[in-house]
């Protein structure tokens, strides 16, 4: 009997983990963690049962690098797993940074540096559209998911049963990726579709509309002599925003400089290694070639925080930038304003108290985070001082939120179901309301597998 067991993200977004198994074989798709708002004082949560299952797992596959899909992988080695990890080449490079950062933040809550290094040594990188053997009778293939660099949908062929796991997918055209395109990728129908449903209830504006609104707001901030602060996720959204801005502003960035801070700088370096047709859109490569750039991050209007002063640490450099009179754009972490340099810019260096300045939110904000509070209208906020204490910040700058998303719309999710022609569908990675809306829109109740159940017998 072939079973599909959802160990994480059954009816929420976070700690994604799925086990596919029969009597003799067990394969894990993703092993992420659930982060909690900093004020809760909670450590991150792992997938259910995975520690106990680890010694009996045969193979692990990772769809992409985001920590809600990958960050528990090193912990598997702590609990007895000894096999390989299959992922794309960019994902392998990115998780090295993200896993080490998580170890720095939470310590050895889930794994040690030894487990992390063991996981990296056992990571096997793959390209898209190339089938590879996992076990006797089981093969896998990665398809471009258009979510972030290296993100993949995973096709498993399990003794002839075809299982398609979307991971996180995007149907919007972004600078680095074309919309996910399924109909020419799979030559046979799918038996089981395991699909994310993140945006099944949320209408999304076009990228063109959203970027136009952002650039207009940045120009307004410039015209009043303010500093524009964009808190952003280090991976994916930040690279997208940088590329949009060099395309929209180009030489105007000579006078309205874009400064990059935080882990974004490390991720930029990895993106720079994979600027080929194999991993990014032809549109981006054409743009770079036409303008004489090897990378979007080579644009003369983009500046690294370390460039500011010849000596001194980053705090000194940030203070110098914050005290400059001319308008600038500061793109920095963290995206949900839960830590990182954004705290210093808003609080310590007092940019949050100047009405000329702007705080422009470009990412999803989890309930309970500082970013969610600000997006909801709260202007008296508490920030961590880095030494276990809190201090009050009164925000008087302009605050605007922009609807960027790295996940497929409801229409995109339904297109995937249409083109894969699955016999059964398991909706996951979405709130209950999103999953219910997806099921209703699909209008095929006989195909649905409840997320808390296992798949019935399959021939």
Q: Could you describe each region identified by the protein language model?
A:
Residues 2-61, 66-70, 75-240, 244-253, ...:
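His/Asp/Glu-rich metal-coordinating catalytic cores
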């Amino acid at each position: 009997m072939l079973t599909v067991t959802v160990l994480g993200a059954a009816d929420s977004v976070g700690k994604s983990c799925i086990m596919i198994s029969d009597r003799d074989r067990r394969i894990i798709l993703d092993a992420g963690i659930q982060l909690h708002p900093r004020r809760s004082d909670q450590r991150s949560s792992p997938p259910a049962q995975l520690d106990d299952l680890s010694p009996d797992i045969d193979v692990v596959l990772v769809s992409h690098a985001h920590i809600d899909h990958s960050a528990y992988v090193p912990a598997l080695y702590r609990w007895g797993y000894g096999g390989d990890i299959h992922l794309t080449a960019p994902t392998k490079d990115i998780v090295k940074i993200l896993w080490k950062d998580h170890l720095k933040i939470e310590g050895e809550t889930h794994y040690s540096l030894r487990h992390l290094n063991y996981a990296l040594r056992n990571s096997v990188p793959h390209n898209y559209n190339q089938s590879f053997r996992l076990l006797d009778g089981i093969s896998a293939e990665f398809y471009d998911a258009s979510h972030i660099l290296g993100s993949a949908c995973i096709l498993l062929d399990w003794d002839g049963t075809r299982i398609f796991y979307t991971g996180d997918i995007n149907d919007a055209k972004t600078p680095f990726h074309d919309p996910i395109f399924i109909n020419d990728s799979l030559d046979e129908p799918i038996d089981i579709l395991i699909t994310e449903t993140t945006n099944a209830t949320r209408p999304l504006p076009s990228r063109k509309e959203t970027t136009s609104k952002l650039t207009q707001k940045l120009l307004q901030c410039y015209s009043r002599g303010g500093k524009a602060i964009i808190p952003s996720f280090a991976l994916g959204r930040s690279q997208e925003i940088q590329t949009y801005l060099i395309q929209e502003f180009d030489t105007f960035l000579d006078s309205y400089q874009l400064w990059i801070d935080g882990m974004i700088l490390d991720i930029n370096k990895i993106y720079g290694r994979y600027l080929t047709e194999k991993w990014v859109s032809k549109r981006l490569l054409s743009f770079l070639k036409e303008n004489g750039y090897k990378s979007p991050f080579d644009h003369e209007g983009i500046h690294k925080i370390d460039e500011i002063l010849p000596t001194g640490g980053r705090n000194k450099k940030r203070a110098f930038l914050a005290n400059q009179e001319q308008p600038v754009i500061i793109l920095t972490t963290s995206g949900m304003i839960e830590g990182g340099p954004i705290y210093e810019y808003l609080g310590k260096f007092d940019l949050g108290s100047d009405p000329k300045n702007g705080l422009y939110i470009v990412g999803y904000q989890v309930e309970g985070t500082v970013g969610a509070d600000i997006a909801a209208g709260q202007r008296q906020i508490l920030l961590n001082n880095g030494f276990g204490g809190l201090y009050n910040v009164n925000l008087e700058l302009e605050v605007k939120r922009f609807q960027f998303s790295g996940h497929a719309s409801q229409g995109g999710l339904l297109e995937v179901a249409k083109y894969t022609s699955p016999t059964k569908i398991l909706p996951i990675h979405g709130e209950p309301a999103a999953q219910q809306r997806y099921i209703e829109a699909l209008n095929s109740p006989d195909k649905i597998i409840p997320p808390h159940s296992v798949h019935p017998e399959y021939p």
